[in-house]
């Protein structure tokens, strides 16, 4: 246990174009090796492509996609009496966002389109429509939680 008390969470500055903290967090998730400018370019270009594909507000489509990706339940391993149980538990809102963004970026990188902008745009559009690999990951996580519902009483 720490004796110094709780550590304050650093507040993220909203991005200059859409004035959204969620966009900044997404850009930070995309960023590799501290190259934030490149990550911003990728994200903003992807949103432009989303606008051309869907003819809708790209931020609205992005929020819709993220809502379809964010998990509500997950399983956590709990050791009881020498056995490991997969115990379903609810996901905190903050972790929901970070998991959703992480999965979005991870499965975007695994797509086959030529540029990262294209991949991200297509994954956002697919996720907003309810298909796409990142949405499948969420459904798989929920299936695991549902299958292990019997161990819910081990929750802590």
UniProtKB/Swiss-Prot annotation:
Q: Would you say which domain of life the source belongs to?
A: Bacteria
Offer one example of a GO biological process linked to this entry: translation
Record-level GO cellular component terms: small ribosomal subunit
Enumerate the UniProt keywords alphabetically.
Answer: Ribonucleoprotein, Ribosomal protein, RNA-binding, rRNA-binding, tRNA-binding
Q: Does the keyword tRNA processing apply?
A: no
Q: What InterPro entries has UniProt attached to this entry? A: Ribosomal_uS7, Ribosomal_uS7_bac/org-type, Ribosomal_uS7_CS, Ribosomal_uS7_dom, Ribosomal_uS7_dom_sf
Note whether Ribonucleoprotein occurs among the keywords.
yes
Checking Pfam families in the record gives: Ribosomal_S7
**SUPFAM superfamilies per record:** Ribosomal protein S7
Matching CDD domains: uS7_Bacteria
The molecular function GO annotations come to: rRNA binding; structural constituent of ribosome; tRNA binding
Q: Which family does it belong to?
A: Belongs to the universal ribosomal protein uS7 family.
For this protein, the record's PANTHER family field holds: RIBOSOMAL PROTEIN S7
SUBUNIT field: Part of the 30S ribosomal subunit. Contacts proteins S9 and S11.
Known function: One of the primary rRNA binding proteins, it binds directly to 16S rRNA where it nucleates assembly of the head domain of the 30S subunit. Is located at the subunit interface close to the decoding center, probably blocks exit of the E-site tRNA.
Alphabetical list of HAMAP family matching this protein: Ribosomal_uS7_B (MF_00480_B)
Q: What is this protein called?
A: Small ribosomal subunit protein uS7
């Amino acid at each position: 246990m720490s004796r110094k008390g709780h550590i304050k969470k650093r507040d993220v500055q909203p991005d200059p174009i859409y004035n959204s903290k969620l966009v900044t967090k997404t850009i930070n998730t995309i960023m590799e090796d501290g190259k934030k400018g490149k990550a911003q370019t990728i994200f903003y270009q992807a949103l432009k492509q989303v606008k051309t594909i869907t003819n809708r507000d790209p931020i609205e489509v992005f929020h819709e996609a993220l809502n379809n990706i964010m998990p509500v339940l997950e399983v956590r391993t709990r050791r009881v009496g020498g056995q490991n149980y997969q115990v379903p538990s609810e996901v905190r809102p903050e972790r929901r966002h970070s998991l959703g963004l992480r999965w979005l970026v991870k499965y975007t990188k695994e797509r086959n389109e030529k540029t990262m902008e294209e991949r991200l745009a297509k994954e956002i559009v697919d996720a907003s429509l309810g298909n796409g690999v990142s949405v499948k990951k969420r459904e798989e996580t929920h299936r695991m939680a549902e299958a292990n519902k019997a161990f819910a009483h081990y929750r802590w």
